[in-house]
Amino acid sequence: MPDPSTYRPAPGSIPVEPGVYRFRDPHGRVIYVGKAKSLRSRLTSYFADITGLHPRTRQMVTTAGSVEWTVVGTEVEALQLEYNWIKEFDPRFNVRYRDDKSYPVLAVTLNEEYPRLFVYRGPRRKGVRYFGPYSHAWAIRETLDLLTRVFPARTCSNGVFKRHKQIDRPCLLGYIEKCSAPCIGRVSAQEHREIVLDFCDFLSGKTDRLARDMEREMNQAAQELNFERAARLRDNISALQRALERQTVVFGDGTDADVVAFSDDELEAAVQVFHVRGGRVRGQRGWIVEKTGDPGDSDLQGLVEQFLTQFYGDQADLVYAADTEADVAPVPREVLVPVLPRDAEGMTSWLTGLRGSRVSLRVPQRGDKKALAETVERNAKEALAQHKLKRAGDLTTRSAALQELQDALGLEQAPLRIECIDISHVQGTDVVASLVVFEDGLSRRSDYRHYSIREAAGDGRSDDVASIAEVTRRRFARHVQDQQAVTEYAAEGHSRKFAYPPNLFVVDGGAPQVNAAAAELSELGVTDVAVIGLAKRLEEVWVPGEPDPVILPRTSEALYLLQRVRDEAHRFAITFHRSKRSRRMTASVLDGIPGLGEARRAALVSHFGSVAQLKKASVEEITAVPGIGAATAVAVREALIETDSSAPSSGATEAVLPAMVENGVDDTPST
């Protein structure tokens, strides 16, 4: 029996968006399908306390060997995908959770004179059309409640229908116009059947014709001055449009298409495909592929070309091997990709030959197809992130990565503590740096630090080297200071996070950056820290004083770890840079006034409308603002007068920065 802790995803790695998740057993069989408004909340509930789960749920969690998910745009999409996958996979725990009952479906009795819509369980009957299955009966009732506003078809039982026919009075739904009331002859049997057929067409994805027909009837009613009917049709059209907007997973034109998306880094790529048949998502597949390293094959155009060739070639082999006369085409009518391959015309011709009829290969630009393409892309990004996190989170993998780093760099011991710095700026302005810490191959966010660069400024590119040198000097000067005080603090029970050096110090860059960092360490007398640089373009590892870089194998766990450390430093630096730039751009002359906090500043600006109007106000007028006393009003007035009489300076910007940032380090733990 698998241990749930062996496949439990990290909570932070699970998206908060709505989606559908699948538990698989160790053999890869789907044993449970579920949907969630928030994937993170739902999935973490399965692993929080195994003993507190329902016995059936606990059995499912302990039987499963893996869990995966698909992100969608809305809860409606998640519901729809859940239905399709329950029908496709027939998961054992889903069925048994329903107490061995069949899943409910939406039945339409086309074999009756007055067809009706209702929730149904049981064997299929001739002359009845079914939509579903659904996981819950309430989902069908919600669908009926929404659509009977537009398609007022009968939903009552035969007994209720006969009773109201006898008393010649409609039920409540008839009075509120959610039923066309065929029981009292408000519509004929043929008119009611047409309403039901339109309802079926809508659920089948044939929405364009319905919208056109309603619009034509609305215009005709308006021309006949039947404005009440025209208004009702207008409301029906709006209701249809709202229903379609909530279902961006569905193509309104009922087309067959494959929607393909990629997410890649320097070494690998994730590809996701949503298979749309009849306008609805019928399946989803995903792969992680290793890049070849050839620029022609590793860019997005090359990835698209390789995927189309291999995937549809294999599909054609499967279809024709099973039945040479099969009417199932290996290629759908449309293939939607993020970019066209280099030889788009040749690829289209090849796909057309496989299908036996014209295939449209294109990039979606707008509408529901563009929306679905964005959903598929989100899933590709999630798949790649999960793949990388799984590799990094595995203890064996992390141990192998540290051992590979030790061997490749000739270190005396495995680099159990790795620190990495990265510089972020825009053309030399708002230059900041980040320092991230990894211990045992995992991030230690409580030790992350921000730096505001004080000495380097200028054209940006050339200042990267000076900025690297400054951050290195300040970080290890702090290490020297902490090392001197470590005995004193240890006696008092305090920990000094920088009292010991990292085993490996990584800088983002090549030989110039690495040599600058090594020079600073040498000047400070730090000799027990290995320094390397990781260059982005070719992922080369540079060592100080060496003319050539160290080339790690592209599939090595050591390179994966270095990439992850470097990418985390880059993310952390960009986040701080954006925050600092935003504070500078929104700094105010009121920021540095003693006794004037954020709430009082907002009250002043709200009362006077702008700082310019505030400058014209007297002390008495400022005092009239709620929460502003006489002393504060005088301070505000004096500060505004002083600002007008002096040239603008950067003091306002510096005043809003925390004290530790002015000293070079923000000691607030960051996430």
Curated annotation (Swiss-Prot):
Residue limits of the GIY-YIG domain? 16-95
Subcellular locations according to the entry: Cytoplasm
Q: Which InterPro entries match?
A: GIY-YIG_endonuc (IPR000305), GIY-YIG_endonuc_sf (IPR035901), GIY-YIG_UvrC_Cho (IPR047296), Hlx-hairpin-Hlx_DNA-bd_motif (IPR003583), RuvA_2-like (IPR010994), UVR_dom (IPR001943), UVR_dom_sf (IPR036876), UvrABC_protein_C (IPR050066)
The answer to whether UniProt assigns keyword Zinc to this entry is: no
Cellular-component GO terms for this entry: cytoplasm; excinuclease repair complex
Q: Name one Pfam family in it.
A: HHH_5
Question: Which SMART domains does the protein's record reference?
Answer: GIYc, HhH1
- Where is it mostly found? cytoplasm
Q: Which UniProt keywords apply?
A: Cytoplasm, DNA damage, DNA excision, DNA repair, Excision nuclease, SOS response
Residue segments, region Disordered: 645-671
Looking at the record, the residues that make up the UVR domain are: 208-243
Which Gene Ontology molecular function entries are recorded, alphabetically?
DNA binding; excinuclease ABC activity
Q: Domain of life, per the record? A: Bacteria
Q: Would the keyword rRNA-binding be found if you checked this record's keyword annotation?
A: no
Q: Which BP terms does GO give this entry?
A: nucleotide-excision repair; SOS response
Q: Which CDD domains match?
A: GIY-YIG_UvrC_Cho
**Role, per record:** The UvrABC repair system catalyzes the recognition and processing of DNA lesions. UvrC both incises the 5' and 3' sides of the lesion. The N-terminal half is responsible for the 3' incision and the C-terminal half is responsible for the 5' incision.
The family line of this record is:
Belongs to the UvrC family.
Its assembly, as annotated, is: Interacts with UvrB in an incision complex.
Q: Report what the protein is called.
A: UvrABC system protein C
- Gene name for this UniProt entry: uvrC
